[in-house]
Curated annotation (Swiss-Prot):
Purpose of the protein: The BBSome complex is thought to function as a coat complex required for sorting of specific membrane proteins to the primary cilia. The BBSome complex is required for ciliogenesis but is dispensable for centriolar satellite function. This ciliogenic function is mediated in part by the Rab8 GDP/GTP exchange factor, which localizes to the basal body and contacts the BBSome. Rab8(GTP) enters the primary cilium and promotes extension of the ciliary membrane.
Organism from which the protein derives: Mus musculus
Any single biological process term in GO: leptin-mediated signaling pathway
Self-association state and partner proteins as the record states: Part of BBSome complex, that contains BBS1, BBS2, BBS4, BBS5, BBS7, BBS8/TTC8, BBS9 and BBIP10. Interacts (via C-terminus) with BBS7. Interacts (via coiled coil domain) with MKKS. Interacts with CCDC28B. Interacts with DLEC1.
Protein name: BBSome complex member BBS2
């Protein structure tokens, strides 16, 4: 069993996911963590006599080895690492919803302070791709920014939604690190500098990411799921009723391979094998785990796994020795093995008994329905599945439909469907009443997003009187654009919005792509020439037209810019296109974006006016306070009372102004998110280098406040020369 080598109990609360460790003087490892009231504490047990007198840092009145850093804002993320290689020691990075502070603890000074309009929800420090200096990369309101040690903005790009987690990892094995981004839209995106090279869709918000080794990384979701990916392939995942607060890679059993360490909301800490997800170590805190880090905290040459709880308890664990042979739990390996083998034995005996009973029944009498209760069904029984589109009626919305049927008179007693991102809890059970049993049933399916999904089916087949059933297991893939029904081009008007591009492919290959990605009726016959198909969205009734000329020119008409982006990305992936330039026009969406940009300007103006008013009021308060105190010292109580009444009124004005500032800031963030998403959508309409050029040019246009240029870039993909 693995026991902690040290335990500390600090009298400071620790905010969840806000723990970092660093050598802030180049020698001694110190813990930094966000605590209450907009402060960060630094625990330094190595130099207890050191006292700070800077304006930001002051000694904690509760503990001599804890110093407090005043941020005066709610801390939203915390990180540490070497930002300036010339200094030779770590820098503390503190992110809030409006700013990023790089603090030099050793010299008690700001390395830099930057206002970030998109906020900082997550932070990671390191080198990215070919960008030479180390960067402090923050993820905020649909945007990613990277700053060097001078605060220069060397990296910027947009992503699909609010960022919740970041990690650096050599994803493609080229010796250079890529940026992993987890966001609110359930996606894990991999950025090679500003280019997205891979996307993995999960089932909930991605709250944590951590590199393990090579291209392998761990992840955690807001629904209690943790798991491990190797590139785009998921190795394993488990789901708990508790929430994963922090994950970290650490070799806890000294086998040369990092395990995934998870700190949970119920106080449990466990280590799982990177290959199987098997628990090889666990411990419990009395409160939720706030963070998991590693460092040589005792300065004895051995790195410890350091776990912190929200109540301020800190425990350090040394990796297990070779003599422990990986046995880090209370129970012995032999006991676990015996228990596992006993369980397998019981399962096999039960299965053997069922086979013996079925064999006896077959020998004693011919097959009839009465024997069905013993679980006997004809040997040639087959299970058929079919996917189709149901346009719905007055009682039911339009949806995709999974049809399941047997090949004879056997009935389907129940169906279990496992699918990510479609059903609540990722599973769905269809269990008809005894009066409605038949050899076929239909299951409505409504995918919320346009992504391909594997449906794993377990179907219980038998007779009405059966007490035992045969279980048929099969997997069926739901095409990416399942929620679009093929309709006649003459049935509705063609959308005004469009994208236009050219590919060096035959129309026959386009038909193949169509069959793979849409649910087409069996009797449909899509012509190669002219290639012209029309679909209706089952979600909102919107129209989608896809046309292709013999020359390879493709036009997609739809008013949904997200759908157009998905279509282009799917076609580019199918035809293995690396670079694709696209001409696009979405008049309605662009007009909405123009209104948003006008609002952003208005909110910025209001923000500046409110800031100026607040500065004026602050000066007036200072003056009134001095006059009031002068009157008190001169025993002029009437004047003193008058001055304090004025101060009271001014204070009320300041509070009202603060509320207006808060509301203004919230509205501004919402509109900035819409702008960043618009740039992301414009980028998704292109592939490869044209995509990166569009995102970069759009940002330059917004910086220079050139709205007309911005819309031209979004339409044609390049800035005017």
């Amino acid at each position: 069993m693995l026991l902690p080598v040290f335990t500390l109990k600090l009298r400071h609360k620790i905010s969840p996911r806000m723990v970092a460790i660093g050598r802030y003087d180049g020698t001694h490892p110190c813990l930094a963590a966000a605590t209450q009231a907009g402060k960060v504490f630094i625990h330094n047990p190595h130099t207890r006599s050191q006292h700070f007198s800077a304006s930001r840092v002051f000694q904690s009145p509760l503990e001599s080895d804890v110093s407090l850093l005043n941020i005066n804002q709610t801390v939203s993320c915390l990180g540490s690492g070497v930002l300036n290689p010339e200094l030779g020691y770590d820098t503390l990075l503190v992110g809030t919803q409006t700013s990023l502070l790089a603090y030099d603890i050793y010299n008690n000074s700001d390395l830099f302070y930057r206002e970030v309009s998109d906020g900082a929800n997550a932070i990671v420090l390191g080198t990215l791709g070919d960008i030479a200096p180390p960067l402090a990369i923050i993820g905020g309101n649909c945007a990613l920014q990277g700053f060097d040690h001078e605060g220069n903005d060397l990296f910027w790009t947009v992503t699909g939604d609010n960022v919740h987690s970041l990690a650096l990892c050599d994803f493609d094995g080229d010796g250079k690190t890529e940026l992993l981004v987890g966001s609110e839209d359930f996606d894990i995106r991999v950025f090679k500098e500003d280019e997205i090279v891979a996307e993995m869709t999960e089932t909930e918000i991605v709250t944590s990411l951590c590199p393990m080794y090579g291209s392998r990384f761990g992840y955690a979701l807001s629904n209690g799921t943790v798991g491990v990916y190797d590139k785009t392939a998921r190795y394993w995942r488990i789901k708990s009723k508790n929430h994963a607060m922090s994950i970290h890679a650490f070799d806890i059993n000294s086998d040369g391979v990092c395990e995934l360490i998870t700190g949970w909301s119920n106080g449990k800490v466990d280590a799982r094998s990177d290959r199987t997800g098997e628990v090889i170590f666990k411990d419990n805190f009395s409160s939720a785990v706030a963070g998991v880090v590693e460092g040589d905290y005792r300065m004895d040459g051995h790195v410890q796994l350091i776990c912190c709880s929200v109540d301020g308890e800190i425990r350090g664990y040394l990796p297990g020795t070779a003599e422990m042979k990986g046995n880090l739990l209370d129970t012995s390996v032999e006991q676990d093995l015996i228990r596992e083998l006993s369980q397998k034995k019981q399962n096999l005996l039960l299965e053997l008994r069922n086979y013996e009973e079925s064999t006896k029944a077959e020998l004693s009498s011919p097959l009839n329905e009465a024997d069905g209760q013993k679980g006997i069904i004809p040997a040639n029984t087959r299970l058929h599945t079919a996917l189709s589109v149901n346009m719905g009626n007055d009682l039911q919305d339009a949806h995709a439909e999974l049809g399941i049927s047997t090949s004879n008179d056997t009935i389907i007693r129940a169906v279990l469907i496992f699918a990510e991102g479609i059903f609540v809890g990722e599973s769905h059970v269809v269990h008809p009443s005894i009066h409605n049993l038949s050899s076929s049933l239909r299951v409505p399916i409504t995918p919320p997003k346009d992504v391909p999904v594997d449906l794993h089916l377990k179907t219980f087949v038998g007779y009405r009187s059966s007490t035992q059933f045969h279980v048929f297991e099969l997997t069926r893939q739901l095409p990416r654009f399942t929620m679009y029904a093929l309709t006649s081009p003459d049935a509705a008007s063609e959308p005004v919005s469009y994208v236009n591009f050219s590919v060096a492919e035959r129309t026959q290959r386009m038909v193949t792509w169509l069959n793979q990605n849409f649910l087409l009726p069996e009797d449909s016959n899509v012509q190669n020439s002219p290639f012209h198909v029309c679909f209706t969205s089952l979600r909102n009734g919107g129209q989608l037209y896809i046309k292709m000329k013999q020359s390879g020119e493709i036009t997609v008409n739809t008013d949904d810019i997200d759908l157009a982006g998905d279509i282009i990305q799917s076609i580019a992936s199918f035809f293995a296109i690396e670079d694709l330039q696209v001409e696009a026009d979405f008049p309605v969406y662009f007009e909405e974006l123009r209104k948003v940009l006008v609002k952003v300007d208005e909110y910025h103006s209001v923000h500046q006016k409110l800031s100026a008013d607040m500065a004026d009021n602050s000066n007036l308060i200072r003056s009134l306070l001095v006059r009031a105190e002068d009157a008190r010292l001169m025993r002029d109580m009437k004047t003193m009372k008058s001055r304090y009444m004025e101060l009271y009124d001014l204070n009320k004005d300041l509070l009202n102004g603060y509320k207006i500032r808060c509301n203004n800031h919230t509205e501004l963030l919402g509109n900035l998110k819409a702008v960043n998403q618009a740039i992301q959508r414009a980028g998704r309409l292109r592939v490869g280098k044209p995509k990166n050029q569009v995102i970069s040019a759009c940002r330059d246009a917004i910086r220079s406040n050139n709205i007309n240029t911005l819309f031209r870039i979004m339409r044609v993909g390049t800035a005017p020369s």
